[in-house]
């Protein structure tokens, strides 16, 4: 955020520039066992959308990008094996992101169809269903911490 403000101010004074902030499809749903990550990505999305509005007409383009699972080192160390086909190639995500930026979009969703479903479906379902499904998914990745028993 500090870097965006510092460089954004210089871009405004020059009357030109562009900012792409990396959010995630996780910005659209609560993720038990990854709560801080999902909340941070929601912040990045909302920060970027608000900043895009504030800087509109001042020569600085702002876009948030919300990819899904991408073939990077992010998932190293999870205790379950992730299917190879479950990830978008990083090159594809970058290419689609830059195309969206060229098209002057304020938010980009560069992933496959399942990423679009993961972004839009939680807006339609009851929240308890969304949280339960997300908890199941993060638990299967080995991210769940055992609950302490009351006794």
Language model features: what each stretch is:
Residues 6-15:
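A short helix-coil junction within the Rossmann-fold of NAD(P)-dependent oxidoreductases
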Residues 64, 81-119:
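C-terminal helical subdomain
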Residues 24:
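Residue(s) in the substrate-gating loop at a strand-loop-helix junction
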Residues 10-11, 29, 50-61:
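Active-site-adjacent segment of SDR/Rossmann-fold oxidoreductases
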Residues 4, 40:
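Active-site helix of classical SDR
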Residues 31-35:
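Active-site loop immediately N-terminal to the catalytic Tyr-X3-Lys motif
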Residues 67-77, 81:
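Short, flexible catalytic-loop segment of classical short-chain dehydrogenase/reductase
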Residues 20, 62-65, 75:
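Hydrophobic structural elements of the Rossmann-like NAD(P)H-binding subdomain
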């Amino acid at each position: 955020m500090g870097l965006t403000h510092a460089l954004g101010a210089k871009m405004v004074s020059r009357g030109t520039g562009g900012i792409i902030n990396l959010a995630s499809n996780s910005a659209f749903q609560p993720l038990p066992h990854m709560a801080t990550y999902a909340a941070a990505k929601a912040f990045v999305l909302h920060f970027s959308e608000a900043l895009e509005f504030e800087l509109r007409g001042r020569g600085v383009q702002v876009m948030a990008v919300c990819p899904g699972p991408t073939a990077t080192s992010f998932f190293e160390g999870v205790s379950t094996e992730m299917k190879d086909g479950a990830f978008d190639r990083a090159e594809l995500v970058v290419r689609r992101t830059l195309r969206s930026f060229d098209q002057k979009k304020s938010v980009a969703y560069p992933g496959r169809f399942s990423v679009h479903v993961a972004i839009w479906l939680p807006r339609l379902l009851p929240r308890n269903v969304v949280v339960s499904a997300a908890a199941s998914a993060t638990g299967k990745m080995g991210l769940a911490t055992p609950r302490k028993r009351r006794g």
